[in-house]
């Protein structure tokens, strides 16, 4: 049985992570920390889900540190866009700095398993600022030395976003069209947000139980086909 803390619970993937956690009988308690109340909170059992809502993200780490019982799994689907943040500098503060601050707080509290929703192409040596930032987040988390770290690298995230992203909307349309012809035409480069959410939960629980592939005992990467496999179990 697992106690899980989640940040990024109001985003497209994070919302599906939360609904998967609520539905999973292996999860006994969920704590979310967010700037607004997650939609799923209205129908979730109060005994299972506790929501901490604060627009002051500087207090999030202390909120996490004070959780009892200590979360055995910490999941981050936290992220924003340059447009929403106003600049890449502001995006970096949230996506990179806050993510690592929260990861350190979870590690220091005694959390065993850390699950990160990253991105395909994440690489500290990337010429692109976004994928370089994602790579820096991954490296920062791995350096913290959790008992087990799980990193999901989805491709295009298919699903309905609250905010408008025209270029992504076009790509999601084509992904959906190809998926209707045959799933194999889409699964390698695009994954549905609900599938990613369920994969994050299933992989986190498996990591907690030591059920990870050989060679991935400390850090377990899940790519497109892995996400599909674990998200459809």
UniProtKB/Swiss-Prot annotation:
Q: How does it sit in the membrane?
A: Peripheral membrane protein
- UniProt cross-references to Pfam families, sorted A to Z: HIM1
Q: Which UniProt keywords apply?
A: Membrane, Mitochondrion, Mitochondrion outer membrane, Transit peptide
What's an example GO BP annotation here?
import into nucleus
Highest taxon in the source lineage: Eukaryota
Q: Which GO terms describe its cellular component?
A: cytoplasm; mitochondrial outer membrane
Q: Which organism is it from?
A: Emericella nidulans (strain FGSC A4 / ATCC 38163 / CBS 112.46 / NRRL 194 / M139)
The record's SUPFAM superfamilies line, in alphabetical order, gives: NAD(P)-binding Rossmann-fold domains
Q: Where in the cell is it found?
A: Mitochondrion outer membrane
Q: Which gene encodes it?
A: fmp52
Family to which the UniProt record says this protein belongs: Belongs to the FMP52 family.
Mind telling me which residue stretches traverse the membrane in this protein? Answer: none
This protein's name: Protein fmp52, mitochondrial
Q: Which InterPro entries match?
A: Him1/Fmp52, NAD(P)-bd_dom_sf
UniProt transit peptide range: 1-36
């Amino acid at each position: 049985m697992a106690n899980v803390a989640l940040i990024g619970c109001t985003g497209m993937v994070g919302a599906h992570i939360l609904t998967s956690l609520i539905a999973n009988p292996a999860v006994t308690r969920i704590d979310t920390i967010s700037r607004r109340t997650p939609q799923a909170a209205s129908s979730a059992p109060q005994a299972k889900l506790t929501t901490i809502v604060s627009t002051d993200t500087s207090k999030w780490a202390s909120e996490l540190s004070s959780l009892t019982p200590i979360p055995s799994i910490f999941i981050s689907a936290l992220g924003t866009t340059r447009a929403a943040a106003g600049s890449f500098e502001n995006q970096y503060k949230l996506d990179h700095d806050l993510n690592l601050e929260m990861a350190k707080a979870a590690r220091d509290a005694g959390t065993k398993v850390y699950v990160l929703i990253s991105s395909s192409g994440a690489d500290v040596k990337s010429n692109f600022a976004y994928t370089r930032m994602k790579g820096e987040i991954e490296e920062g988390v791995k350096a913290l030395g959790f008992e087990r770290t799980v990193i999901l690298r989805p491709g295009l995230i298919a699903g309905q976003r609250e905010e408008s992203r025209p270029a992504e909307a076009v790509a999601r349309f084509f992904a959906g069209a190809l998926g209707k012809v045959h799933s194999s035409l889409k699964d390698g480069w695009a994954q549905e947000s609900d599938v990613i959410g369920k994969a994050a939960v299933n992989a986190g629980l498996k990591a907690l139980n030591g059920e990870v592939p050989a060679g991935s005992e400390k850090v377990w990467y899940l790519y497109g086909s892995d996400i599909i496999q674990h998200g459809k179990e």
